[in-house]
Amino acid sequence: MTPSDIAIEPLTPQRLPDFLDFFEHRAFTDNPRWQSCWCHFPHADHATVVWKERSSAENRAASCTRIENGTMTGWLAYAGTAPDAPAIGWCNAGPRRFIEGLFDEPEPLADRIGAIACFVIAPAWRGKRIATALLDAACAGLRAQGFAWAEGYPRADTANAGEAHHGPLAMYTAAGFEVIKTEPDGGLTVRKRLVAP
């Protein structure tokens, strides 16, 4: 199966069961220590929350609430177009203001930036350009929402696929993103203009 054989759909409250099924059964079969996140980390207020003290159930409930109220958005990749096709990938992307947990400093252009926080691809589907298809869908969706830029947060290098949850730098640069900031710990900010100035 290739990216042209998969279906990519925006996460909506109606697709919450698909999101939960993906995270419960396929997302982290090779890296169970990440399973408790439920992709809530970028949304948490780290000034008031001690992340390591949060339980999987707390993060699951918080993500469910955010999905239901529209403050956690993104795209799901499905293994085909059949109604019962399982979700095999996820990209957390939406307004930058929804993922302030990733930032230490305010961004003056935040209201014009669509942020791509993370990718999760089921292990059996890695290396098949699913993340690239999700990135393309995220950029198209963010452009349609009126954002001027898409922003991602890869690391300069990643030891393995399980650690590349922000997406590999090479994927972003191939899609036209440019590095605009480098952190001392190897974290990067990459940005792509979505609309003409």
Residue locations for each model-derived region?
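Conserved acetyl-CoA-binding loop-helix of GNAT-fold acetyltransferases
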Residues: 116-121, 127-144, 174
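Conserved donor-binding loop and adjoining core beta-sheet/short helix segment
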Residues: 29-51, 79-81, 88-101, 105-110
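C-terminal "cap" of GNAT-fold acetyltransferases
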Residues: 164-175, 180-197
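Conserved acyl-donor/pantetheine-binding loop and adjacent beta-alpha core of acyl/acetyltransferases
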Residues: 65, 69, 83-119, 126, ...
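A short helix-loop-beta-strand connector motif used in the catalytic cores of GNAT acetyltransferases and
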Residues: 47-76, 98, 115
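Conserved GNAT acetyl-CoA-binding A-motif
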Residues: 135, 142-163
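Conserved N-terminal entry element of GNAT/NAT acetyltransferase domains
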Residues: 1-45
